[in-house]
Amino acid sequence: AGAAANKELMWKRAKGFFDVVAYTGTGSARTVPHSLGVPPEMIWARSRTTTEQWVVYHSSTTLGSSPPESIISYLNLNNRSGVAANWNNTAPTDSVFSLGTATTVNQSNIPYIAYLFATLDGVSKCGGYTGNGSSQTIDCGFSSGSRFVLIHRTDDPDDDGVSGDWYVWDSLRGIVAGNDPHLSLNTSAAQVTNDDSVDPHNSGF
């Protein structure tokens, strides 16, 4: 059998860019301090010792009149985003993020890990866009293109509870003007190599 081809993706903790927070759940609504220095635009959180989903907050996700802090997505599922009080209906600040009482983020005496992401000019971009059914450029404010792209659809066009996978492209495997291999964070499937969904662009993709 051939050797497995593994890829590792790493982020360095830095103010205004990325932070990692370990905390223990209390079962009561609360805030958790962080060192990002700016309000996180995306949060991934998960229990470290119990069987739970990866819960996602994203500042660009809205559902009807519901704001981002009232919405959750699941990083390990292709489910549509939904309204829930995991973030205690409170937007994160430059020093804390808020938790409700959901066991996915705040069960009493359970240890959790949270990854916090933010936009740092010229380095990273957390945002959203609306598809147009045709080609479009997503301007991330970069000068030499994207090295890592994560895309997830948040609506549910077929009203079946499914929105789409969490697709990942990176420059190591290739972001080119042609087919680009992509992985899905929510599946264990091998990468798809015969698809041309993204192309390189100096400002983003």
Where are the language model's segments positioned?
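Surface-exposed molecular-recognition determinants
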Residues: A1-F205
